[in-house]
Amino acid sequence: MEHVKVGAERAGKDWRDIEIVNRAMVHVTDNKEEGRALFRSHFAPYFSNPVYNRFLEWCGYPDVAAEIREGWAARDRERTTGAFSNEVIDEIGVIGSTTEVQARIREDANAGITTSIISPIGRVELDVAYQTFEPFRGDRFEL
């Protein structure tokens, strides 16, 4: 939020009046290890792209970005996907039970996110998409 506040100030605006959008990569599951494996398989190649790799580094994960870059260059899939510790995945992704993912989106809102875009992790079957969106239906979720 620090960057948003600085940018708003430079533009002569109050950061609290700006819509702050976050695309949340969500996977609803009771098996967090399976969810983390899904995250690794989809986001290691994504963050191997130089543009997104630099973004990951800018976001405060320089060691992860370097490991992905080096693993990708070596064509070592295990090294590339293994660059993400569980802790990093839990910071970047939103993985867990219905209650856990709802709580995380509420935490983000309390931190200043005004609009959360709920996105399934990767290309998913329709039933998994419904499972992802279900906890955020209007009759099941409020801030």
Task: Go through each PLM region and give its residues.
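Active-site-adjacent structural elements that line small-molecule/cofactor binding pockets in enzymes
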Residues: 1-143
